[in-house]
From Swiss-Prot:
Residues 65-223, 270-426, 492-649, 659-815, 817-975, 977-1144 form the MAM domain. It is found in: Membrane. Glycans are attached at residues 204, 290, 340, 641, 841. Disulfide bonds join 230-242, 237-255, 249-266, 458-469, 465-482, 476-491. Residues 28-49, 229-267, 457-492 form the LDL-receptor class A domain. This is Apical endosomal glycoprotein. Probably involved in the sorting and selective transport of receptors and ligands across polarized epithelia. One of its GO terms (cellular component) is membrane. Residues 1181-1228 are cytoplasmic.
Length: 1228
């Protein structure tokens, strides 16, 4: 075997490394093995940090090392021992599967992630994903990732870290699981030497076990690199690294060689790590010293201590009962005004929002201890990390430090590594002061203010105001229950002139925090939002935490809120591109991004309005920011003048009852829902997005790829409405446009009832507005309120949805112009024997019916079916299905429908049009070989009319008839297989195939603005007003994805002519879309014509003669043969001339292809012959390679089917060669 010269050296190195028993990595600069995968780029191209569970892409310090699984698995390996295993997978592989339909990186189905699929085994099993060996994690190292779990699919998730002989559990949970992608952030702590990370999912017999993992990020994990000189004031470590002065003697190995914690440097510090006891500290009650090895008392307990980062390390934990306080107190220290005494400590708050940690300073008065002064207060859920903090103390009197912890239900408060700096001088043991302070007085004896509070008469958690006791659920509910509104005082609305800050509380755990500050003239911003220099605002400030985490400020629990609820505020923001300022809502433990400051900010105060809408209680608002305060320029962030307006849910306006809306003034009664991070937006017409009302006005718009949307869909719903009449007609205009757009649904919601699906459409409906209408059936009780909701589902990611001109009128609607039976029976009523049934094969009542519907091609799709077996419908008897009334027609129309008749002859399907009289338009008796067939009827009706389908039974056992996808289109019915696309796609179907990516051909005209490139004129009319079918190939990803446009089933033919015009436009030759013509039958698919195109701004004609001995469909396949680029493929004026040979047309506009004769018989012999030909070509190519040429000829034609068999548009097929491209099974 010969190897190319450029691969030979790589192969030799690999074999040499294997022979020496060493790990071989693509390390271009040959770093020592200890410097590989250590979160530091030693090579100029960072190649020493690839396949490490992440990819090193930048040599910039503090850059995160990430893996988004788009190119490979980054070295992560499945080490599962059962069939329940991890693999790298792509989003949307299964349309209705349990996994995510989009990845987290891109939010589309083109993205990749690691996934463990469903497992049908009855035994419990665990799928384990393990990282490669990593080395030397810094104390600041943070691992972040996103995971996705279908509801109740997994029993447990856990994240472990193994180093040496110990395995640390970094995170573990058994739910509850939230919707969509959820973020996990854990701190690894300082890890010396080698370590691995494992992510595992455990399922049992009651769980399917579908889990996905994406966007793994290692943040700030690298140790500082050696430097010849350190910045002024920094400490130079023994290994030549530099650390900041406050990192000395702080209980963490910041240098990487522990020289910053050298006992010689830290000998004057008083450090207590609880490994051998409490040291000089004492407790009144409630604290106990413990470790995490073995079984833990509570799931919220720390899995490791801070000092040793080990489960065997000791810490203090609060064991006080909920409602009581555990108190730890220090020895007495001497007072000093000249020197700061610094106290560094690490605390742990996890498991309960009600847990509380406080730090008090208690100074000694002349004779007795003074009232303790609160210096730090933290409460709530701060995660599983040990949080560092520090206080600097200046006291003229001797003092003690008191640490108080109060645990909420299921919560834990922990302490570790209490460090007093060298300037904290102990009071001599036998001093007079020491003897006078026999011990601290319990905290409960000291009120925190000098005002004597009245005796509390309300229960804990209740607010006392006058004679009222306001319960917790009525606090911050946007309704005043107290006379002075005290129950709404600390609920987010504030100008920050009061120290209470309107209830906003900092919950940061890292190097940044939110603080209530006074504006200074010499700093930025120079004043608050009111331009007052002494004014106050909420400002982003430095903190003593060790992690590079976002700063967070949170309100108390709020709600419920009404649909008009808005937050008005002023903000200041200036940052480099990586910084941000955002507003988040926290609801049921999950976070939704509401707003983010644009770009790098303006550096001045800016007013902003954010719609919050109707939300259930409890929810909280949170300001989140990450800014490099040490970076160049005056970077920073601030918030002021926060006002929550119109949030009372009881407040109504006239517009709340306005269902009819053209969205020109506002959104009337319609408002956005908040179940996911995808949202409808009211926008003004611009570019290719034009409203329906005027073409220049407003409408509701949804872009499924609008960042940062990752949720399943977006809701647009009304306020609760009171019915006016028993039946109302709701009409609206909608647009579903794009090569891979999702589903738009309309539903009705009543209290304590399941939502009622009224209408739905999926996939592209062309680049235009369509009108739809639905009859609303109200309950007899007039007091029963209802809501209407439109939901745009993100099961497609290329295209847009839009709504406009919603109108409601009394009385029922006309019959719909199209019906897929997916949401309802569309008003069709069974007559006669009443045997027609609305069902799907998966959940049907009829004994017999099609395996799949026509709309979705799945067993879950719906249709109408009648069982014509003699025991149900005797021979000669009729089962009728009658539509509602259609409005009169101003011009002839074509009624199309798809029917399915069993192979045992079920009888006859008759179609009648009932105007003033009933007239039969069509009669079908052929069974159609158990496949969906297209039927069509020309309709002319000057009055209101109905369509009636009649099933006449033949008395045959196990027989049935079914109907699906009934549609009424303007203009006469076209011939089978033919279409000029002026009124639509005729009988051609663009149903997306999930196995091909779920893409669809679209329908448009040159005059209609489009976000995708398209021909400027059609071929039929040669003008911008003409229409055509087209597909934009740039949305396709790699891996054989394609879009199909399929004809209706066509009968067997000895000779027929297919004639069509096509258009292809690509900027360069290597940007190549491909157009194929396939013939599909029960035996597979056969490619009969192919063209790969580049820029040709003209329409070209092709003729193909076809013959086939069995029924078939014509398929136009658009796919990608090169690099993705904007470029359309379009077709127009398709003619199928049954029983006719192709004739050479006279030259006309554009080029003309020569006719091609293609006898089609997709038999086993031909497929086998094709296999032999391909094997022969492959063998010839292999033999050629054995000569090992040094370089190919630069002017040789590229090998491939295109240049061999096709020349421009003149097609020459070898007489007996066929191809069988991989594709879904029989399309019939």
């Amino acid at each position: 075997m010969c190897l190319p010269s450029h691969l030979l050296s790589t192969w030799v190195l690999f074999m040499a490394a294997q022979s020496l028993g060493k790990t071989w990595l693509p390390n271009h600069c040959r770093s020592p093995i200890k410097a590989v995968c250590n979160f530091v780029c030693d090579c100029g191209d960072c190649s020493d940090e690839t396949q490490c569970g992440f990819h090193g892409a930048s040599t910039i310090p503090s850059t995160s090392f990430t893996c988004n699984f788009e190119q490979d698995s980054c070295g992560w390996q499945d080490i599962s021992t059962s069939g329940y295993r991890w693999l790298r997978d792509r989003a949307g592989a299964v349309l209705h599967g349990p996994g995510p339909h989009s990845d987290h990186t891109h939010g589309t189905d083109l993205g990749w992630y690691m996934a463990v699929g469903t497992h049908s085994g009855k035994e419990p099993s665990t799928a384990t994903l393990r990282s490669p060996v990593m080395r030397e994690a810094a104390p600041t190292c943070e691992l972040r990732l996103w995971y996705h779990i279908a509801s109740r699919d997994v029993a447990e998730l856990r994240l472990d870290l193994t180093h040496g002989v110990e395995t640390l559990t970094l995170w573990q949970t058994s739910g509850p699981w939230g919707p969509g992608w959820q973020e996990l952030a854990v701190n690894t702590g300082r890890i010396q030497g080698d370590f691995k990370v494992t992510f595992s999912a455990t399922r049992n017999a009651t769980h399917r076990g579908a889990v996905a993992l994406d966007d793994v990020e290692f943040r700030d994990c690298g140790l500082p690199i050696p430097q010849a000189r350190c910045p002024l004031g920094h400490h130079h470590c023994q290994n030549k690294a530099c650390v900041e002065p406050h990192q000395l003697c702080d209980g963490e190995d910041n240098c990487g060689d522990r020289s910053d914690e050298d006992p010689l440097i830290c000998s004057h510090h008083m450090a207590t790590d609880f490994e051998t006891g409490l040291g000089p500290w004492n407790q009144l009650e409630g604290w106990t010293r413990n470790h995490s090895a073995g079984s833990m008392v509570s799931p919220a307990w720390p899995h490791r201590d801070h000092s040793r980062n080990s489960a065997y390390g000791f810490f203090l934990i609060s064991v006080a009962k909920p409602g009581t306080t555990a108190v730890l107190y220090s020895p007495e220290f001497q007072g000093s005004v000249s020197n700061n005494c610094s106290f560094t400590f690490y605390y742990y708050l996890h498991g309960s929002e009600a847990s509380h940690f406080q730090l008090f300073l208690q100074a000694q008065g002349l004779n007795t201890p003074q009232v303790p002064v609160l210096l730090r207060s933290r409460h709530g859920e701060l995660g599983t990390a040990w949080v560092r903090d520090r206080v600097d103390i200046q006291s003229a009197h001797p003092f003690r430090i008191l640490l108080a912890g109060e645990t909420g239900p299921g919560g834990v408060v922990g302490l570790d590594d209490l460090i007093m700096s060298s300037h904290c001088m102990l009071v001599p043991a036998m001093s007079t002061l020491q003897s006078s302070l026999s011990g601290p007085v319990p905290l409960a004896l000291y009120p925190q203010t000098s005002i004597k509070l009245p005796q509390q008469t309300c229960e804990p958690g209740h607010l006392s105001c006058g004679d009222l006791c306001v319960p917790p659920e009525q606090l911050c509910d946007f309704q005043k229950h107290c006379a002075e509104g005290e129950d709404e005082h600390k609920c987010g609305t504030t100008d920050f002139e009061s120290a209470s800050a309107g209830g906003w509380e900092d919950i940061s755990v890292g190097k940044l925090q939110w603080q209530w500050v006074e504006a200074q003239e010499k700093s930025k911003p120079a004043g608050d939002a009111n331009r007052d220099a002494p004014g106050h605002f909420l400002s982003l400030q430095k903190a003593w935490g060790q992690l590079r985490s976002e700063a967070r400020a949170l309100t108390p629990a709020l709600g419920p809120s009404g649909p008009h609820c808005e937050l008005h505020m002023a903000y200041y923001f200036q940052s480099h591109p990586q910084g941000f300022l955002a507003l988040v809502v926290v609801e049921n433990g999950f976070r939704e991004l509401l707003w983010q400051a644009p770009g790098g900010g303006s550096g001045s105060w800016t007013e902003e309005k954010i719609i919050l809408g109707a939300r259930r209680r409890p929810f909280q608002l949170e300001f989140v920011s990450l800014v490099d305060l040490d970076g160049p320029g005056q970077q920073g962030a601030g918030v002021d003048n926060v006002t929550l307006r119109d949030c009372n849910p009881m407040v109504t306006t006239e517009s709340d009852q306005e269902l009819s809306c053209n969205f020109e003034r506002d959104s009337c009664s319609w408002h956005t829902g908040h179940l996911t991070d995808a949202h409808w937006h009211r926008i003004k017409s611009h570019g290719s997005q034009l409203d329906h009302t005027t073409g220049q006005g407003f409408f509701m718009f949804l872009d499924p790829t609008d960042p940062p949307a990752r949720g399943q869909g977006a809701l647009l719903l009304t306020r609760p409405q009171v019915p006016v009449v028993p039946k109302e007609c709701l009409s609206f205009w909608y647009r579903l446009y794009g090569p891979q757009i999702g589903t738009l649904c309309l539903a009705m919601r009543r209290e304590r009832e399941e939502d009622i699906l009224l209408w739905s459409r999926s996939g592209t409906h062309g680049n235009r507005w369509h009108q739809a209408w639905v009859t609303l059936h109200h309950q007899p009780e007039a007091s029963t309120k209802y809501q209407l909701l439109f939901e745009g589902l993100r099961n497609g990611y290329h295209g847009t949805m839009a709504l406009d001109d919603i109108a409601v009128r009394p009385g029922p609607c006309w019959a719909p112009k199209s019906c897929s039976f997916e949401d309802s029976d569309c008003g069709f009523s069974p007559g006669g024997w009443g045997l027609w049934t609305h069902q799907s094969n998966a959940s049907g009542l009829a004994s017999w019916g099609p395996w799949i519907d026509h709309t979705t091609g799945t067993a879950q799709g719906h249709y109408m079916v009648v069982d014509t077996s003699p025991n149900v419908l005797p021979k000669g008897h009729v089962a009728a299905l009658t539509s509602e009334e259609h409005q009169p027609l101003s011009q002839p129309a074509c009624l199309t429908f798809w029917y399915h008749m069993s192979v045992p002859n079920p009888g006859t399907l008759r179609v009648h049009v009932e105007e003033s009289t009933r007239r039969q338009e069509l009669s079908i008796s052929a069974h159609g070989r158990s496949a969906w067939r297209l039927g069509s009827v020309n309709v002319q009706a000057e009055q209101a009319w109905k369509v009636v389908f009649e099933a006449v039974a033949a008395g045959v056992e196990y027989s049935y008839m079914a109907l699906d996808d009934i549609s009424l289109q303007d203009g006469p019915c076209p011939q089978p297989g033919s279409c000029d696309f002026e009124t639509g796609l005729c009988g051609w179907s663009h149903l997306p195939w999930p196995s091909l990516g779920g893409y669809s051909w679209d329908w448009s005209s040159g005059a209609t603005p489009s976000r995708y490139p398209q021909p400027s004129v059609d071929h039929t009319l040669g003008t911008e007003a003409g229409h055509f079918a087209f597909f934009e190939t740039s949305v396709l990803g790699p891996g054989g994805q394609a879009a199909w446009l399929r004809s209706e089933p066509l009968p067997a033919t000895t000779v027929s002519c297919l004639r069509f015009w096509y258009y292809m436009g690509f900027p360069e030759h290597f940007y190549k879309g491909e157009l194929r013509v396939l013939l599909s039958s029960a035996r597979g698919q056969l490619a009969v014509w192919y063209q790969g195109g580049h820029l040709r701004d003209q329409w070209l004609q092709v003729q193909i003669e076809l013959s086939n001995s069995e029924e078939f469909q014509i398929v136009f396949e658009a796919t990608l043969g090169g690099q993705p680029a904007l470029g359309p493929i379009a077709i127009d004026d398709v003619q199928y001339l049954a029983g006719q040979q192709c004739k050479q047309p006279s030259p006309s506009q554009g080029e003309v292809a020569a006719p091609v004769s293609v006898p089609v018989a997709v038999g086993g012999a031909l497929l086998f012959f094709m296999f032999l030909v391909l094997m022969g070509l492959g063998g010839w190519h292999w033999l050629q390679k054995q000569h090992c040429p040094g370089q190919r000829s630069t002017d040789a034609a590229a090998s491939g089917f295109a240049n061999i068999l096709f020349n421009a548009d003149h097609v020459t097929l070898p007489e007996s060669i066929t191809s069988n491209p991989q594709s879904p099974p029989d399309l019939a």
